[in-house]
Swiss-Prot record:
Organism: Homo sapiens
Entry GO terms, CC: cytoplasm; cytosol; endoplasmic reticulum
Residue numbers of Phosphoserine PTMs: 49
N-acetylserine modification, residue list: 2
Assembly notes: Associates with the 40S ribosomal subunit, the 80S ribosome and with polysomes.
Keywords assigned by UniProt, alphabetized: Acetylation, Cytoplasm, DNA-binding, Endoplasmic reticulum, Metal-binding, Methylation, Nucleus, Phosphoprotein, Repeat, Repressor, Transcription, Transcription regulation, Zinc, Zinc-finger
Source organism, top-level taxon: Eukaryota
Job description of the protein: Single-stranded DNA-binding protein that preferentially binds to the sterol regulatory element (SRE) sequence 5'-GTGCGGTG-3', and thereby mediates transcriptional repression. Has a role as transactivator of the Myc promoter. Binds single-stranded RNA in a sequence-specific manner.
Protein name: CCHC-type zinc finger nucleic acid binding protein
InterPro entries per UniProt: Znf_CCHC, Znf_CCHC_sf
Residues the record lists as Omega-N-methylarginine modifications: 25, 27, 79
Tissue-level expression: Expressed in the liver, kidney, spleen, testis, lung, muscle and adrenal glands.
Places the protein is found: Nucleus; Cytoplasm; Endoplasmic reticulum
Amino acid sequence: MSSNECFKCGRSGHWARECPTGGGRGRGMRSRGRGGFTSDRGFQFVSSSLPDICYRCGESGHLAKDCDLQEDACYNCGRGGHIAKDCKEPKREREQCCYNCGKPGHLARDCDHADEQKCYSCGEFGHIQKDCTKVKCYRCGETGHVAINCSKTSEVNCYRCGESGHLARECTIEATA
């Protein structure tokens, strides 16, 4: 998610505190402890190895900002115009995933990896990120090299004004604070 998108709905043009989707923590993520996050739909995200889930249509493989749907869809029936709690269709059962390892078929309390450390860089168990031997590039997300040696160019965004092409230290807009 880029710095100029709402944390709740993934759309640009407003911040989470001004989100038109309303109440509470909306459809964003809430902290789960142990370094992972759980979406309001019950999906847990503990590493980049888990699939992307779109919060607009509920499908995997893309995020809401890349979704073809113009309006949010009901997570139960997939149609627009209402949300799952107001859906008239029978509730569709979904397989829950373990909050620890992200795999279906068991709960976190029954997970074989419950007491193991998980690396947030490679997603493997048994070590933490600072001890990981698989270096990961923060520019392209691939393993095997670091950002300074990355051949892929990336668009830089200014944290002050949100525009691309320059950094905050190069920004011509006055800081307001």
